[in-house]
């Protein structure tokens, strides 16, 4: 079953993009699926929120967890949420979703989980699962700018291309200092000021950065290859702009702060993060709120076998906490 109405209404200026019209379907492999199933199944859940639907891999597995739970509830559910309207439009008519009354697909951010619960006349969920990585669909979409390989792609970087401000416009709306600070804070890029200066110089010359290749070339010139020989010189800058444009860290922080209000006592939150900024927020949120009991003293990592089969999982970290009764 699907929900056609979006959970969120944009409060900021929006700029539509053709990227929102379709979503290419690629072979997306969910990260740490066995671990997610293990930690969620143990509580025999009746309502699970998959806050990052993506390719639907975790949602399918979580639906089977519901089936295994043997609940007395008449309406066990997996509430799947995704920010990308193209993904929701693509998948809402798939038979495994449309014909399964246990699955509800919503358009919105995981920060709007309480709205999804309210739409179904529910007050609490038993589990929340978040996989904070980029999906294969997003990486494959040439209109998004998530990959460095398409030089003429628009520098967009939005998860929801129908709302908010694309990265190239964000750059034009901020000062050189604000750009440098964002690249340093969200990308931990040591050469952020060099990069910001070049971006700002182009804007002053009325030749602003609008394409992926233009920003990649600036990063190549500003980041000494010997300093970051293990990663592409543009990696940290693109990460920083993506985080800024989508308010990723703010949304994660607010969600974990509010989650104890709508996760049932005894329920669990499982978060898969992919870089230190996200992981730090998750760790501190679980540690600082007495309503959480940390179940993973150290973050769990994917097995060697999974990394070999799915290289994008190599940097994943899973933390799980229980809502104290």
Swiss-Prot record:
GO CC terms of this entry: cytoplasm
In which compartments does the protein localize?
Cytoplasm
Where does the chain bind S-adenosyl-L-methionine?
A: 56-58, 82, 110, 131, 138
Q: What's the name of its gene?
A: rsmH
Task: Spell out the NCBIfam families in the cross-references.
Answer: 16S rRNA (cytosine(1402)-N(4))-methyltransferase RsmH
Q: Which UniProt keywords apply?
A: Cytoplasm, Methyltransferase, rRNA processing, S-adenosyl-L-methionine, Transferase
Q: What does this protein do?
A: Specifically methylates the N4 position of cytidine in position 1402 (C1402) of 16S rRNA.
Compositional bias (Basic residues): 314-325
Q: Which Gene Ontology molecular function entries are recorded, alphabetically?
A: rRNA (cytosine-N4-)-methyltransferase activity
- State one Pfam family annotation: Methyltransf_5
Q: Where is this region: Disordered?
A: 1-28, 303-325
User: Where is composition skewed (Low complexity) in this entry?
Assistant: 15-24
Its BP terms in the Gene Ontology are: rRNA base methylation
Record-linked PANTHER family: 12S RRNA N4-METHYLCYTIDINE METHYLTRANSFERASE, S-ADENOSYL-METHYLTRANSFERASE MRAW
Q: What is this protein called?
A: Ribosomal RNA small subunit methyltransferase H
What family does the Swiss-Prot or TrEMBL record give for this protein? Belongs to the methyltransferase superfamily. RsmH family.
Reaction equations catalysed: cytidine(1402) in 16S rRNA + S-adenosyl-L-methionine = N(4)-methylcytidine(1402) in 16S rRNA + S-adenosyl-L-homocysteine + H(+)
Q: What is its EC number?
A: 2.1.1.199
